[in-house]
Amino acid sequence: MQNNKNYTEKFITDKVMRRDYSKIKSNFEGPNLLEIQVESFKRFMEKDLKEVISSIFPLKSPQGKYTLAFKGLKIKQPTKDESACRDEGKTFETPIYIDLELTDNYTGEVKRAQRNTKTGEDGIYLGAIPKMTEKGTFVINGIEKFVISQIVRSPGIYVLGKSSIKLNGSRKRLFEGKICEIYPSKGTLMLGYIPKDRHNIQIVARDSSGDNAQTFSVTTLLKAFGLTSAEILKIFNNEKEIRESLEIEKYAPEYIFENSQENEIIFKIYSDAHDIHEKADRRESNNKLKEEYIEQGSPLLSKLKQLIFNYVEKNDEIDALLHENKDVEDASFIKNNKKLYDEREEIINCIISEKAAKDIVELLGINIKNIETLRHLGKASYQIALQQHFFNKRLYDISSAGRYKFEKKLLLSERLYQKVIANDIIDKKNNILIPKDTLITKEHIELIKKESRDKNIKWTKKINLLPTALESEIEQFLEYESIAVYKDNDLRDETTEIVGLASGCKLQTLTVADLVATTSYIYNLNYEIGEFDDIDHLGNKRLKLIHELLRARIATSMARIEKFINEKLAISDGSSNNITNVNDKGIDTELDREIEESDMSDEEKKKAISVKSIINTKQFQSLVKDFFNSHQLIQFIDQQNPLAELTNKRRISAMGPGGISREDPNLDIRDVHHSHSSRICPIETPEGMNIGLIMSLASLAKVDENGFIVAPYYVVEDGVVKEDYKYLTAHEDDNYIIAESSVQLDENKRILDEQVVARYRGSTGLFSPNEVDFIDIVPKQVVSIAASAIPFIENDDGARALMGSNMQRQATPLIKPYAPIVGTGTEFKIAHDSGMAVVAKNDGVVEFVDSQKIIIRNDNDKLDDYKLIKYRKSNQDTCNNQIPIVKVGQRVHKSETIGDGPAMQNGELALGRNILVGYTTWRGYNFEDAIIISERLVDQDVFTSIHIDEHTIQCMKTKNGDEEITRDMPNVSDTAKRFLDNQGIVLVGAEVHEGDVLVGKTTPRGNVETAPEDRLLQTIFGDKSKTVKDSSLKVKHGQEGIVAAVKRIKSSDENGSELPDDVIEIIKVYIVQKRKIQVGDKMAGRHGNKGIVSKVVPIQDMPFLKDGTPLDIMLNPLGVPSRMNIGQILELHLGYAAAEIGKKQLIQIAIDQLGYEKYISLFGINEIIAKKLYENISNLIKHKQAKQAKDIDLIDVTIILKELGLSYDDIGIKISTPVFDGANHDDIVSIMNEANIDIENNKGKQVLYDGRTGEPFDGLISVGLTYMLKLDHMVDDKIHSRSVGPYSKITQQPLGGKSQNGGQRFGEMEVWALEAYGAAYNLLEILTIKSDDVQGRNQAYNAIIKGHDVVADGMPESFKLLTKQMQGLGLCITVETKDDRMVDINEYTLNQNRLNNDDDEVILDENLKEINDSNEEIFNTNFNNNDYDDEENF
């Protein structure tokens, strides 16, 4: 080894040591890669589920007699474990019980649900929710599924140059200008904007019908919520845009009572109020007439009527006083009676507010029935209806993410940057924090944020609302902050008011302060205060995770349950027009009276109205079931290999409900954005229609509580990188200068460079170290886990890196996988977090290990039992098998890998094999990316994989009788059922082929009347063909393998398996295939270099190296330069050097007497084998008297390795070269020199010798070790042929596709080819009897079985269709017969059909006779069959 190492030796586990060539050292432990799934579901079960269920309670009956209250929630453990659910096709779910309390408010009686006799649980059974497994999946009906995360636009406020409102019928209404878009999670989308060439601010919102977008002034909306004109002008400091908005709307005292079309209802009520008031005065009837008038008509108008009556009365009071004081001057009178005038003005403002609310409610078509508060009598008004529409969370929800976005946009601290303030900013003690005329810088912003959080700045004010507006939740948050700034920083002659939100609002609904701050933002844009939003910025998007999707679905179900309960309570309460009388106990209802007068006992009467009788939980159960079975974002988990499963769970989709369509051609949506950095991988995305719509989370990214993707960065202070780190959202990124992780640091982590490359607000530039706020953790945080597993990805073209990332997920787990010699250091993390490895739950010592389980005694002296998965079929039909990698007595730590899963080696990801590859052509067999492989890869099972197919059959109860599992099926040959036992089920270990019976089953036929003599014969000869038919499970077309297991699930089992109705038994047969690599299989490297195996060459014919080592694979060198994936060449040379050093180390360790433990850590081999290997190598060294490695002949080492079941595949030092931070040119040169590879003369290339002739090839050839994968696209799944098969009922042509045993389409161009060769008879057969000539087909079949010449004289169905289409055009079609007669086509077809039908009947009779003869032989054979005994179990 060299003294000056350019690497560090990094021990991944006890058995894995890698040379780490990374330049940036970091101890940062990334988040668990499954956190996005597991933590989200944990949040749902611990918090969201209870919140949603309890949100509808308490519920009161309309008359107030009953109250139903929520008292608690119980989440029970699943009744079946995960593996049982998989085997039985059940859902792994946890039952939910809710504790409800029904109180009779008149008697004080309290009722609760009684104990469930079946389950023994208290409370109401609400339903069952599928439980997430430890690896982040759900078992639904025996199949593993997962929830894909959806990326959607975040609720919040957006400032845009153009926007649109979607209307019905795919219509849109477009707007341009300075637009503030209020985008809720649930509710009406509103736009606030200044129209072109105007200065007034307008609001646009879609009406409830969706047919139109309605426009009104922003001041109209503010007045509708209870602000007066004076309050509006005061808040906005008399801004021009606000004044103009007030001028154009008609909600002012001088307009409100005028007789116009807009004020028709006001004027009518005003006139009626005058008349009633005068009549009331004359008759002295006080308020009777007034109350009668107010209660007439719509209850929503009552508030407006009341206000107008108050105005009339107040006016009369003032007029009366004026009449009494007619000699007093007006000014003096008004001064003396200011209170009266103020009260009248307030009433007028309340009328204006109610009228504005009424107009907006009618304009938007707000559904009054949805307004919950209107149930309470006396509170009905248009103002409350409008407030409920916008301020009730159940109707208008901006969510926590929306509130976060509102604060980020509307707080003053976010809007003052680079502006000169016109007022002092003072604290609560009147100390000046920032004097006026100061240009606000980044440091000032940080100070303002800090002081605002502490509520220490004296700029907070409160919105004053009219008293009528304060009757609902509108008053929850009315605080705002304001400050004046100069419109122009240089001139400083005019100011404008910036009105912002007060910090500290946690409400998830819209507030009046939000609308006020939004209005300010709109007119501030005229003076370049604020900024426009980039809608594609990741800060404006968020992820919907499993907890949010489930929460929304359960909220829907609870709303339906609430409606059902309310209806039941109304009936029980007597609100359904059943109220009889009211006594001192309260309201006596029809239901109560019926119960009281009935013959029921006292106990029965008490139970008549119970908790269970008023709740129906079926909606909850059906919606949850529907979500997990049919929701667009629920998908089968890809279990091809650990990387595929892990990547699947970290997948992000822009499609789904409310998302983007895959047909949308918008490139801006699909493109990479600068804000994706360290959050979404710029490389990994599918090819094709879904490109850019399906994405992957970056390696170190997480999702915060609001659904925003956050990325970690180290904190930098005064040019020094600190140990602590912080997660930032994409919007927070824009506020800081973030340096790349490649900067030079000293031992104290101070940045040495005078200027560093850093990002700020989407652009990259040079900054001094003292300006830097944060620094990247590691370079690999930019890409996803799949891309981070590709070494030298920085040397690959982006398109090829994309293919490499995707193809790693298609790699098939091999029988003996090997971790890559040239890795990136992420292999352990991927395998560990994938969920397929066995991971220790606690610290402890291993007490027992075998192939089935591992037992560890933990530090609490308790036994942890780990059952290993053995040969389980995955969703992709690959083999999931776990192998222990610990030994008895070994000390293990929490989270340590103790067992390998599929495609793992010693805890590391191992998708393929390290293969000796040469880039050379060979007789043209690797033309166009084809791959030539050595026979060694086949013979030694290098790329052999195991595949498991599941075959299921159900034994059913039918109307004709029960089906039966039996060995005695009618009309089935003995050959087909040769592997069945005496019960009719295939034997484990049998090698079955296409058509073999796996499970014998008979189904009863319908009742068929038979003669007595026929029944006698059937009994004598055992003929069941007349009473039952064969419905056995057989091996499908094109399949074969060895039966690995048979599972029988009966409803009568002791473990109580619950089977569907009418199912007696389910039998599952698992067939295993061992697939060797063969011609037609697809292989690939990690750099997007893919190809099909074109030839398997004998080992002796393969080109070989100077020492006689034959190549394993030959790749075409022309596949490298045009594809620009040079990373594969660097991997090739580095891998070869590492393998050569491994050979040297194998001998040198024994020479230096370092002990066998070094073999274990360096090569990852078993302890027993390592001891024996060390002993044998040491003996060889003594025998040869070797002093250094080169003194030992490698052939001797090869023999020793072979005796121990090893090969040079097991020997080789492992390299870690992280992406963007790995081995550079100097490192590769250094390691090649260490391996004694001549790079001075031949640049690392080798002389290759032709295996057929022994002659060297002309030029030097690049040879080395490359990590190659065998992909899921195997020829066994694709190759297919058809001799006899099904036909389409409509066209009568053969079906297509392997699954339907279909034929290959013989298209137009293929017809041309046969025409060119003059193959007339072949062409005739293909287009007629092999296609859709039904009669000709039958005749040909009969001729073949009789040995006659084939004569096809039928008419193809497609020709018949052509003639009908021509007749449809009015053309007369005739046929010229052999005797020169002209016959109409219809008559000719009819005659042909008649003749062919006669022929068919003759053929049918002959065939039936043959079948009957053969059946008789079969029955006699069965009767005399003594080959097996009934008692014998095959």
Curated annotation (Swiss-Prot):
<dbReference type="InterPro" id="IPR010243">
    <property type="entry name" value="RNA_pol_bsu_bac"/>
</dbReference>
<dbReference type="GO" id="GO:0006351">
    <property type="term" value="P:DNA-templated transcription"/>
</dbReference>
<keyword id="KW-0808">Transferase</keyword>
<dbReference type="InterPro" id="IPR007644">
    <property type="entry name" value="RNA_pol_bsu_protrusion"/>
</dbReference>
<dbReference type="Pfam" id="PF04561">
    <property type="entry name" value="RNA_pol_Rpb2_2"/>
</dbReference>
<dbReference type="InterPro" id="IPR007641">
    <property type="entry name" value="RNA_pol_Rpb2_7"/>
</dbReference>
<dbReference type="GO" id="GO:0003677">
    <property type="term" value="F:DNA binding"/>
</dbReference>
<dbReference type="Pfam" id="PF10385">
    <property type="entry name" value="RNA_pol_Rpb2_45"/>
</dbReference>
<dbReference type="GO" id="GO:0032549">
    <property type="term" value="F:ribonucleoside binding"/>
</dbReference>
<dbReference type="InterPro" id="IPR019462">
    <property type="entry name" value="DNA-dir_RNA_pol_bsu_external_1"/>
</dbReference>
<dbReference type="Pfam" id="PF04560">
    <property type="entry name" value="RNA_pol_Rpb2_7"/>
</dbReference>
<dbReference type="GO" id="GO:0000428">
    <property type="term" value="C:DNA-directed RNA polymerase complex"/>
</dbReference>
<dbReference type="InterPro" id="IPR015712">
    <property type="entry name" value="DNA-dir_RNA_pol_su2"/>
</dbReference>
<comment type="subunit">
    <text>The RNAP catalytic core consists of 2 alpha, 1 beta, 1 beta' and 1 omega subunit. When a sigma factor is associated with the core the holoenzyme is formed, which can initiate transcription.</text>
</comment>
<dbReference type="Pfam" id="PF04563">
    <property type="entry name" value="RNA_pol_Rpb2_1"/>
</dbReference>
<dbReference type="InterPro" id="IPR042107">
    <property type="entry name" value="DNA-dir_RNA_pol_bsu_ext_1_sf"/>
</dbReference>
<dbReference type="InterPro" id="IPR014724">
    <property type="entry name" value="RNA_pol_RPB2_OB-fold"/>
</dbReference>
<comment type="function">
    <text>DNA-dependent RNA polymerase catalyzes the transcription of DNA into RNA using the four ribonucleoside triphosphates as substrates.</text>
</comment>
<dbReference type="Pfam" id="PF04565">
    <property type="entry name" value="RNA_pol_Rpb2_3"/>
</dbReference>
<dbReference type="Pfam" id="PF00562">
    <property type="entry name" value="RNA_pol_Rpb2_6"/>
</dbReference>
<dbReference type="InterPro" id="IPR037034">
    <property type="entry name" value="RNA_pol_Rpb2_2_sf"/>
</dbReference>
<keyword id="KW-0548">Nucleotidyltransferase</keyword>
<dbReference type="InterPro" id="IPR007645">
    <property type="entry name" value="RNA_pol_Rpb2_3"/>
</dbReference>
<dbReference type="InterPro" id="IPR007121">
    <property type="entry name" value="RNA_pol_bsu_CS"/>
</dbReference>
<dbReference type="InterPro" id="IPR007120">
    <property type="entry name" value="DNA-dir_RNAP_su2_dom"/>
</dbReference>
<dbReference type="InterPro" id="IPR037033">
    <property type="entry name" value="DNA-dir_RNAP_su2_hyb_sf"/>
</dbReference>
<comment type="similarity">
    <text>Belongs to the RNA polymerase beta chain family.</text>
</comment>
<keyword id="KW-0240">DNA-directed RNA polymerase</keyword>
<protein>
    <recommendedName>
        <fullName>DNA-directed RNA polymerase subunit beta</fullName>
        <ecNumber>2.7.7.6</ecNumber>
    </recommendedName>
</protein>
<dbReference type="InterPro" id="IPR007642">
    <property type="entry name" value="RNA_pol_Rpb2_2"/>
</dbReference>
<dbReference type="GO" id="GO:0003899">
    <property type="term" value="F:DNA-directed RNA polymerase activity"/>
</dbReference>
<keyword id="KW-0804">Transcription</keyword>
